[in-house]
Amino acid sequence: MSDYSSLILRYWYSNQPSRWLLTPLSGLFQLAVKIRQWAYTQGLFHTHILPLPVLVIGNLTLGGTGKTPLVIWLAQFLRQHGYRPGLISRGYGGHAQNYPQQVYPDSDPHLVGDEAVLLARRTGCPLVVGPDRVAASHALLAHSDCNVLLSDDGLQHYALGRDIEILVVDGVRRFGNAHCLPAGPLREPLSRLRTVDLVVTNGMPQGGEFAMYSQLQDARHIKDGTLRPLKKFRRTKLHGVAGIGNPERFFSQLRALELTIQPHPFPDHYGFQSEDLAFADQQPVLMTEKDAVKCIRFARDNYWYVPMDVSLPASFGAQVLSLLQQAAKKKLNIETTG
């Protein structure tokens, strides 16, 4: 992670007196956000309503909160309950010339984005990426038989109508200094919390929030998929590599398992090259699963990645199913009366 990025994070997530210098700009940003929201609610900007229930999973802050693991959990959960979920995503980190793009487990992450390839591999669901969420959703419906749509991110993309909004919160960093950009990390004011359907906290929740706990799984060799329990790395010095929104979370989880790591943080969606991981020694390299999809093309024998699974309370799943049933009935009534 660059010194500039680290400086910005310290500024946003600590009580820096100098933040007041940017407060007027944050006020203008917040005003623009409210005007835009008002324009959508008044019909000045068009919201596209899809014929199937739409769940949007997003956050209020810049940076990683754990959306992708939750999307994976939701896709697997819904399939277990008889649904056929389809996914759309922005495709961050991808550089395709044309969008929308369908994503498959063997797609090139440099074209469609690292998170998209990870989602395709972990869920097995049809997936389309593109900056235009509406166009991506129509492309998904044209090439799949999904009966529920999950939008990875897109909470602020009001052009796409949604039936359920799930907000993900970092349980440690929360909302930083609670200021909107650029004085703070917020994309929208904290009042937005009152309008979402469910709040999931990655870590310790507060009142009314559902706890999501993550657990690192056995390491997998990046070349052949060989499994190795993480405890087998305890007597070895390791390189920890993370190009995610909050690299320190990954490093802290490794340290909590009594692993000795030299951390190597990189920006989110970083386009890894072989020289980035050309360390002087031959000690094992442990990276996130998201980073592994980009590093496999130049992988060495000492490269391992660490999958992560999350757990949520049964009450959260029950709430999701209840909201989905309500959304489906509402759409059926609209079709019947229309």
Swiss-Prot record:
Keywords: ATP-binding, Kinase, Lipid A biosynthesis, Lipid biosynthesis, Lipid metabolism, Nucleotide-binding, Transferase. ATP binds at T61, L62, G63, G64, T65, G66, K67, T68. The keyword Cytoplasm does not apply. GO terms for cellular component: plasma membrane. Its EC number is 2.7.1.130. InterPro entries: LpxK (IPR003758), P-loop_NTPase (IPR027417). Pathway: Glycolipid biosynthesis; lipid IV(A) biosynthesis; lipid IV(A) from (3R)-3-hydroxytetradecanoyl-[acyl-carrier-protein] and UDP-N-acetyl-alpha-D-glucosamine: step 6/6. It comes from the Bacteria. It is an enzyme of class 2 (transferase). One of its GO terms (biological process) is lipid A biosynthetic process. Pfam families: LpxK. One of its GO terms (molecular function) is tetraacyldisaccharide 4'-kinase activity. Transfers the gamma-phosphate of ATP to the 4'-position of a tetraacyldisaccharide 1-phosphate intermediate (termed DS-1-P) to form tetraacyldisaccharide 1,4'-bis-phosphate (lipid IVA). This is Tetraacyldisaccharide 4'-kinase. The lineage of its organism: Bacteria, Pseudomonadati, Pseudomonadota, Gammaproteobacteria, Chromatiales. The gene is lpxK.
